[in-house]
């Protein structure tokens, strides 16, 4: 665990050092759980969003996009249930004066059982060597079975408390399992209570006439209240979807783990409207489709898993998370939910407007059911960063820091470098860069030795480096260096675009999804 924490600290430091992510308001010592994306971070973030957007709106004829406002009529949040039910169970430690989410404390305790099991497996693997069967060992070893049973007992009790909204039981679990404050090391806990996560502000020119409004805690409601607008103007027929990328805001008390949990974040959400009774079939299809989208990036299939919800949200009849293995454990990067017809029915009730769809095939009107896919851009960004960072030991004894980013998401696709800053090489390098820059994000670099320049590009995840030397002036060939293998080959300038495109093209990645 300590090794993983150390690794995560290095990733966070690397992100700031190379211009991926900065603490917001840094010169004023920052603002808790708020971050800015730097010059490389914004490019990679935009590439992630483009991959998602095009996978939704280009690959599906029945999915269109919108961009709804952050401020919306306050009654929307009453209708959606956020005013009454958008809460976290919080608990304070009297000694450290720190506040925690009770459910997270218990989930962390469950993770300790998982860690114990993995340690037993690792010890056995060393003992038995290549013939070791991890799954068989887990299912037969008495020590592992004992740990697994204790975990299951905790999980069952925790799931019931969450489903029953039993705050007293959540505290009792914390006491019974002797969960201590990570700072003070004590068990001096307050009672658990609910805390609403929405930011409230006022809209209006005078305080007397001002209206209370909220910063949206999710983008989904902007889609639901525009259901009729989109359906009618685009003549959409069910099943169809509406996609949106936008900022959301939550007053997270326990914001932590860098950009994983923030107070201002960005979501990519798609609401897919279906016939009542067909929602669970579509739920299963979108589970499969979304996992395929993640795995297509090549960050390791073993790093993903589904996690079905122990407690369903007030609007759902099925829900699962796609979790990714971060340095601090498996964590949610995307949620897929069957939201039933709750949202549209609620908005019909509170607005007084009929929100239904007339199905010509069934010759009847109904309130559609909804399948939601919701992915956090920032969490996706972090998963890419964490899976890509490596301190690689080279044969000569040196260490290079490299980001093995999915090449389609890399902020810079190709760096163009003159070997020396004379003899016309910079002019030739500029000519090549001007040829490539209309299709690929390029960087020109002529400072320091070629080796140092290669290391700089490795550290920001640039897939290709193109070096212009004296031979280039004679035969129009260049050296192209591949980031991951560090292999170099001599090619004609006319071959450059084809080689680069075959590796970094978003089109090829999208084709793999079809």
Predicted regions and their residues:
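NTP/phosphate- and nucleic-acid-binding module
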Residues: 1-514
